[in-house]
Amino acid sequence: MRVLLAPMEGVLDSLVRELLTEVNDYDLCITEFVRVVDQLLPVKVFHRICPELQNASRTPSGTLVRVQLLGQFPQWLAENAARAVELGSWGVDLNCGCPSKTVNGSGGGATLLKDPELIYQGAKAMREAVPAHLPVSVKVRLGWDSGEKKFEIADAVQQAGATELVVHGRTKEQGYRAEHIDWQAIGDIRQRLNIPVIANGEIWDWQSAQQCMAISGCDAVMIGRGALNIPNLSRVVKYNEPRMPWPEVVALLQKYTRLEKQGDTGLYHVARIKQWLSYLRKEYDEATELFQHVRVLNNSPDIARAIQAIDIEKL
């Protein structure tokens, strides 16, 4: 099976990709989106979001990375897709699933689900702009407020010439509510298409991954939030390994505080460590105590000292 690391805006950036791919066995990472409006973006934008482009589109541990674009205008999606692969990206991905109000308000992300023709035009333009040997993938949800258009959406992606399709098994309006996950709908789409379909949504452990694949028939999954809850989740999902022990999680957090974020204003680790601990609390009781300790700290040096001061040998 294949396990992909999902794009998560404001969460899974290059530093987190570096850490997670070092302790996992991901087959591919998708970047946070590059927002495309009405221009060919400068090289520095691509390098900021995907510094791995300067390392043959791989993380330091060797996992492939693909740039994701978000936009609605085919011409500019095409030009920026061409630039991404010229810079070394292993293919490109089109975001048609982001539920953010800000993104949707500007006509991107999940808004495209309302009109499958827009998905077709965008994906087709990207496919034509990218060399045939490189993949063009599309990430969608089942629809905007219902799944009525799920087949139209899927057909649009395939007819556009996309290499593969990632389906998040909920509509935009359903957000991330667990009770609405519909792996069967993903399976219905998989049976309809001739291109690979990757299942996404509510995959938290070995059991849920097996259940998702059994219901959907997919042999590839994409994981997002769960990758932060359990830092070695790809190995749990692929090989039924136990979750990472808490001392190893702390060691990972300590390494994180030592990494430098390019262009950091001093607030990067403050926000990200707290954010990561809030995810870890869902799986590790020890993370709650640590979160309570650092939540009142407001600068990177203090956060780093608090994390570094933990004696792993005593855990």
Swiss-Prot record:
- Entry annotated with the keyword tRNA-binding: yes
Keywords attached to this entry: Flavoprotein, FMN, NADP, Oxidoreductase, RNA-binding, tRNA processing, tRNA-binding
Please, what other remarks does the record include?
DusB and DusC together account for about half of the 5,6-dihydrouridine modification observed in wild-type cellular tRNA, and DusA accounts for the other half. These three enzymes seem to act site-specifically on the tRNA D-loop and contain nonredundant catalytic functions in vivo.
Q: Which residues bind FMN?
A: 7-9, 68, 139, 200-202, 224-225
What SUPFAM superfamilies has UniProt attached to this entry? FMN-linked oxidoreductases
- State the similarity comment: Belongs to the Dus family. DusC subfamily.
Residues annotated as catalytic: 98 (proton donor)
Q: Which GO terms describe its molecular function?
A: flavin adenine dinucleotide binding; FMN binding; tRNA binding; tRNA dihydrouridine synthase activity; tRNA-dihydrouridine16 synthase activity
Reaction(s) catalysed (UniProt annotation): 5,6-dihydrouridine(16) in tRNA + NADP(+) = uridine(16) in tRNA + NADPH + H(+); 5,6-dihydrouridine(16) in tRNA + NAD(+) = uridine(16) in tRNA + NADH + H(+)
What organism, scientifically named, is this protein from? Escherichia coli (strain K12)
Return the broad EC class.
oxidoreductase
Name any cofactors this protein relies on: FMN
Q: What is the protein's known function?
A: Catalyzes the synthesis of 5,6-dihydrouridine (D), a modified base found in the D-loop of most tRNAs, via the reduction of the C5-C6 double bond in target uridines. DusC specifically modifies U16 in tRNAs.
Q: What is this protein called?
A: tRNA-dihydrouridine(16) synthase
Q: Does the keyword Transcription regulation apply?
A: no
* EC number(s) given by UniProt: 1.3.1.-
